Amino acid sequence: MKWLKQLQSLHTKLVIVYVLLIIIGMQIIGLYFTNNLEKELLDNFKKNITQYAKQLEISIEKVYDEKGSVNAQKDIQNLLSEYANRQEIGEIRFIDKDQIIIATTKQSNRSLINQKANDSSVQKALSLGQSNDHLILKDYGGGKDRVWVYNIPVKVDKKVIGNIYIESKINDVYNQLNNINQIFIVGTAISLLITVILGFFIARTITKPITDMRNQTVEMSRGNYTQRVKIYGNDEIGELALAFNNLSKRVQEAQANTESEKRRLDSVITHMSDGIIATDRRGRIRIVNDMALKMFGMAKEDIIGYYMLSVLSLEDEFKLEEIQENNDSFLLDLNEEEGLIARVNFSTIVQETGFVTGYIAVLHDVTEQQQVERERREFVANVSHELRTPLTSMNSYIEALEEGAWKDEELAPQFLSVTREETERMIRLVNDLLQLSKMDNESDQINKEIIDFNMFINKIINRHEMSAKDTTFIRDIPKKTIFTEFDPDKMTQVFDNVITNAMKYSRGDKRVEFHVKQNPLYNRMTIRIKDNGIGIPINKVDKIFDRFYRVDKARTRKMGGTGLGLAISKEIVEAHNGRIWANSVEGQGTSIFITLPCEVIEDGDWDE
């Protein structure tokens, strides 16, 4: 197949066309040359024979004038023999007016003398008195040759007295033509050989730049734009090669710009905080960034090529064609396991002609925003509820007092006591809300001090131990002093809140344990406060630090809690670069863990 491909190449075609043109040209020239040469040689031959015959005619006329027709036979024979010495003459006969052969130059035909010649051309010449000629094939001993027969009548006093019959060997002329044709054919063959060789070189000068451009085109199709076509001259092909090099350079620059823009676009799409999905005009997903995959919780191969509306679970809502008309956004639950909510906006990729080539979906994660909004609504609802409950209670007691209960010496003090307790609870609630608001706005000032934590925690435990006679406090505190830096007032609030909750929810033989451990490697310490209370269900442990969250709302409200204590504690601990969390087993108790940074202070570091 390689030879067939080579045969079909432009290089071979140019050589073939070049050779064919040479062959056609030489054939035309050869045909014209040989035809004219043949005509010229034949005309010259016949002209010579005709002149020769004219001379012989004149000589015979003289013989007849001198000796008459009876005594002229011998002289005519001698005269014919004299003229027959030429090589091209085959035979000469003289035939009288009665078609009787008078003389002949050929020895083998001497027996025909005085016999009648039965030749139509002779008869025609004698009867018409005009010369004629024709070609015949005759064997002179070496095979049949072409012979030109020429008849010329002899006239004396304008009367035909006889006819000169001449057979001339015209075959030599044709042999000469054949030799010339053979020379011409050999010359043509040599010329063709030289033409083929030169044709290959000439065609190569034309096809080499074209081949280079073809190879460069193949390289360009593979993404290689660095090669350049060699320019061999200033002709049209050279100009084409120059234009091709300029085109290759511009394509290379355009490709580089396109690749740069593509990389930039890929980088932007990859690192966008929003999910991006791009489809073809049929809605099949072709591009998806990492954020979108993360939102769906799927691998790339599980989403590429799938129908976008099916992936978004919107195929029952509307059709793909409606995206172009509908600019509304949608809230979708993309990942139910993680509770991820995204706002989806669609846009259409449209050409200038109006033809739609694809669609783009932008997924904006609004989970946190929705959660904040939900928490805000819950917060407002909780605050409203927490304020409405004591206000309703206070309003009822005040109305009772207004209606005369103040006169009852037993009820009036009770009503006033309940009103005061509810007022104090509202004050605590408002104070907690104000403190949380300051922390949210980062306007709550923290005054840190270097604190001996051992002394600090023991002082708090002692205070609670004195007021809670029914609770046992167990201490596991290192003897080595642990120094830390925090705001003592705010951290006191944290530990008071945790210890109070531990005492509130303990049951039976109430017991609160304190465990303190230091990790010098990380300059951290961990405080664990454990009770033997009712415990917290495992699915609610992480929620106890949320605002207004209560595991047992009725019991918490009965004990005077606002539901904000642990939320405030979490804000304070995190403001000190710490962490607070809980572990609990329902029915066995709860452990609150607090980690805080601690300071490594040597004895020489204290100022005297």
Curated annotation (Swiss-Prot):
Provide the PAC domain boundaries: 314-378
Give every HAMP domain span: 204-256
Q: What is its EC number?
A: 2.7.13.3
UniProt xrefs under Gene3D superfamilies: 1.10.287.130, HAMP domain in histidine kinase, Histidine kinase-like ATPase, C-terminal domain, PAS domain
Query: What's one Pfam family the UniProt record gives for this protein?
Result: HAMP
* GO-annotated biological processes: osmosensory signaling via phosphorelay pathway
Q: How is its activity regulated?
A: By zinc. Zinc-binding negatively regulates WalK kinase activity and thus autophosphorylation.
Reaction(s) catalysed by this chain's protein: ATP + protein L-histidine = ADP + protein N-phospho-L-histidine
UniProt PTM: Autophosphorylated.
Q: Where in the cell is it found?
A: Cell membrane
Keywords from the named record = ATP-binding, Cell membrane, Kinase, Membrane, Metal-binding, Nucleotide-binding, Phosphoprotein, Transferase, Transmembrane, Transmembrane helix, Two-component regulatory system, Zinc
Q: Is Hydrolase a UniProt keyword of this protein?
A: no
Q: Give the matching SMART domains.
A: HAMP, HATPase_c, HisKA, PAS
What's the protein's topology in the membrane?
Answer: Multi-pass membrane protein
Note the PANTHER family from the entry. SENSOR HISTIDINE KINASE GLRK, TWO-COMPONENT HISTIDINE KINASE
**Record protein name field:** Sensor protein kinase WalK
